[in-house]
């Protein structure tokens, strides 16, 4: 940056930008009527020149444009100006505003050593150039006049230039001291003024913290502003530099015992008045803030405004305590929050995803130990889908990217600025970068496509999502397909993963949001061979397993359509066959009949639950038995003995297929009655064996 010093003097109009109090966001502008002499210090840039001007021109411009600053009822201020010659452009203090008003620099003929200089930049507005000075006024709650030699010597010069109302009269302070001294003779203790309140009263309030709030208990009808002003003015013993000392009680000062002809009654009158005022101050429930504000106001119109303000605050406080006022909701609450944020000078809360500032509720989303503040729509979308709401669903994107808001709409302009800020800050937040890499800024259909890229290339795997998408586009029911897929998952055997097997896909491929449930891909030929080589007790659905038929077995005898009832399995002890798989198969039913869906039963899938070491053989050919010849008339009359249930005495029950007393040829010739064996009942012991055993006993 190039700097160039210029020691030239010129004249330019003056612009003074100032604000009152640090918390105030209102800036004021004061312009001079004529050009004032300035001195050029240096040129920082080609169009940025720093100049300095005498403080007297600044004071005259501010007093002419803002006369309330020179009013004695406003109190005193501390003044600061922005020094552009400092490296960080700091605010430099100039002291009391009253001292600047009383300074001799307001008059001609002063030396250059006593001149106070302030600096600023030269600004251009069109074809007019002017020097711009920035000031800040900080109000002082208690400003005591400090006697200095400059103050007394400058009063003579001030009387010729300022009106009499702005000139401080030191005799008023002496008069107030004499009056307060005369009152001390009557044993009256005047409390020290602290922030416009009694020190004794503040001490009493600190000693009793259990005292309820004044706003909640104050009766509006009993608040008399005149009594407030008398009570506050009675206890003020000091005066500011621009206000005359307020006498404690004019009537009490006139009725002093030394000047009153009736001296005996005057002392008792003063004492009674003092005690009455003490009791009034003790019994008063006025808040310190209300008393201070009332003490500072002397205009009747301002008193009425304060009175109405106190009434409104008391009414609101009582209404909130009694829960009569409902919470502000909807659009009014949103605008109230935005207005409050603007008054505080802060950025309103906004959604870190879509950047909106108008929402019914705010929600927090936690991901990777990072908490994000989201609007109601983005928060619900994140909770339900664990992904950020896409841009095409944002109301801000539709409002600001496609069309521009109106220039006269303040809230729309604010929302546009916050939206741009949020999109800029998203680039610096790590959680959005991680979600973007994981594909979590889009709906779940994109997430499934990312998962499918990790699986091995399989033609079945590629065709499956297309079929699901076609069904989804047609809008047809997918309930049957979902049930079949879920049944296949539950019935499929557990196989250890191998490098040849493919990864499983999420359930979103079939249109479900349950991501914990996965679907198997099409099995390879190696896995199918492994399943076929498993033993029988590892398979849960043996009816649907298609085992190859052996050519060495006997052909299936022809049966009629009416004789399709279940058969009792028997074994052929004379036949020696090492192939055990043929004995664990259920004979296929005739193809002419339509297979009916039957309820699952453990007796149908596993006839015998035995140890692996024990050989229980079941022949493929199951002839029928007819026990009608073996049952006698006496046995038929006894229903308990001839019931199809097993006998109560299990000691005499013989194992099926291991009894050598019955001839194999006789078993094949005797048909079995359908009334004794149910489709889902366990295998029964032949009744002829049972009867023969009982007869022997």
UniProtKB/Swiss-Prot annotation:
GO cellular component, one term: chromatin
Residues in GATA-type zinc fingers: 351-378
Subcellular location: Nucleus; Chromosome, Centromere
Annotated stretches, region: Disordered: 443-484
One Pfam family linked to the record: GATA
GO biological process: CENP-A containing chromatin assembly; positive regulation of transcription by RNA polymerase II
Keywords: Centromere, Chromosome, DNA-binding, Metal-binding, Nucleus, Transcription, Transcription regulation, Zinc, Zinc-finger
Main location: nucleus
GO MF term set: centromeric DNA binding; DNA-binding transcription activator activity, RNA polymerase II-specific; RNA polymerase II cis-regulatory region sequence-specific DNA binding; zinc ion binding
Assembly with partners or alone: Interacts with CENP-A.
Protein name: CENP-A multicopy suppressor protein 2
Organism: Schizosaccharomyces pombe (strain 972 / ATCC 24843) (Fission yeast)
């Amino acid at each position: 940056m190039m700097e160039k010093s210029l020691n030239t003097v010129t004249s330019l109009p003056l612009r003074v930008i100032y604000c009152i109090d640090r918390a105030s966001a209102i800036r004021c502008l004061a312009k001079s009527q004529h050009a004032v002499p300035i001195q050029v210090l240096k040129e920082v840039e080609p169009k940025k020149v720093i100049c300095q001007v005498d403080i007297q021109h600044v004071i005259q411009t501010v007093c002419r444009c803002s006369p309330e600053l020179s009013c004695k009822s406003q109190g005193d201020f501390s003044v600061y100006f922005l020094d552009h010659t400092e490296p960080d452009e700091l605010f430099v203090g100039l002291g009391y505003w009253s001292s600047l008003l009383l300074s001799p620099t307001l008059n001609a003929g002063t030396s250059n050593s006593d001149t106070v200089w302030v600096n600023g930049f030269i600004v251009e507005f069109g074809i007019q150039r002017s020097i711009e000075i920035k000031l800040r006024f900080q109000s002082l709650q208690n400003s005591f006049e400090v006697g200095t030699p400059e103050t007394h010597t400058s009063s003579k010069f001030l009387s010729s230039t300022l009106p009499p109302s702005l000139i401080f009269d030191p005799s008023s302070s002496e008069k107030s001291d004499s009056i307060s001294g005369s009152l001390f003779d009557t044993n009256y203790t005047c409390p020290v003024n602290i922030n416009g309140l009694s020190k004794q009263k503040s001490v009493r309030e600190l000693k009793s913290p259990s005292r309820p709030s004044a706003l909640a208990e104050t009766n509006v009808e009993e608040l008399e502003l005149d009594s407030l002003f008398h009570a506050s003015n009675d206890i003020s013993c000091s005066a500011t530099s621009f206000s005359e000392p307020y006498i404690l009680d004019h009537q009490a000062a006139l009725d002093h015992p030394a000047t009153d002809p009736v001296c005996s009654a005057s002392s008792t009158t003063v004492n009674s008045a003092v005690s009455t005022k003490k009791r009034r101050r003790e019994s008063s429930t006025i808040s310190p803030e209300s008393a201070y504000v009332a003490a500072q106001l002397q205009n009747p119109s301002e008193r009425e405004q304060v009175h109405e303000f106190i009434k409104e605050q008391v009414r609101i406080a009582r209404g909130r305590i009694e829960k009569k006022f409902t919470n502000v909701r909807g659009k009014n609450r949103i605008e109230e929050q935005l207005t409050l944020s603007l008054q505080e000078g802060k950025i309103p809360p906004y959604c870190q995803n879509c950047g909106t500032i108008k929402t019914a509720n705010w929600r927090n989303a936690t991901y990777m130990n990072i908490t994000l503040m989201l609007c109601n729509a983005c928060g619900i979308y994140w909770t339900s889908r664990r992904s950020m709401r896409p841009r095409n669903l944002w109301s801000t994107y539709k409002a600001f990217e496609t069309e521009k808001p109106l220039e006269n709409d303040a809230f729309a302009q604010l929302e546009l600025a916050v939206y741009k800020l949020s999109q800029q800050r998203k680039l610096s937040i790590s959680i959005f970068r991680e979600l973007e890499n994981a594909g979590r800024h889009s709906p779940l259909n994109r997430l499934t496509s990312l998962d499918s890229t990790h699986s091995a290339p399989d033609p079945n795997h590629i065709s499956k999502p297309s079929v699901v998408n076609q069904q989804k586009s047609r809008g047809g029911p997918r309930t049957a397909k979902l049930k079949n897929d879920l049944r296949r998952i539950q019935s499929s055997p557990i196989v250890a993963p191998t490098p040849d097997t493919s990864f499983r896909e999420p359930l979103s491929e079939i249109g479900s949001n349950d991501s914990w449930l996965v679907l198997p891909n099409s099995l390879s030929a190696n896995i199918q061979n492994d399943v076929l080589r498993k033993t029988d007790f590892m398979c849960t659905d043996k009816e649907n397993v298609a085992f190859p038929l052996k050519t060495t077995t006997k052909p299936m005898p022809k049966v009629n359509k009416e004789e399709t009832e279940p058969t009792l399995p028997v074994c052929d002890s004379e036949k020696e066959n090492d192939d055990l798989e043929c004995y664990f198969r259920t004979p296929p039913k005739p193809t002419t009949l339509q297979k009916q869906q039957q309820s699952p039963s453990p007796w149908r899938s596993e006839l015998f639950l035995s140890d692996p070491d024990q050989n229980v053989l079941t022949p493929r050919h199951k002839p029928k038995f007819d026990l009608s010849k073996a049952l006698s008339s006496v046995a038929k009359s006894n229903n308990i003995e001839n019931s199809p249930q097993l006998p109560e005495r299990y000691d005499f029950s013989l194992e099926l297929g291991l009894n050598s007393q019955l001839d194999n040829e006789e078993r094949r010739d005797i048909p079995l009655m359908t009334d004794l064996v149910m489709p889902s009942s366990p295998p029964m012991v032949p009744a002829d064996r049972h009867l023969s055993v009982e007869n022997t006993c």
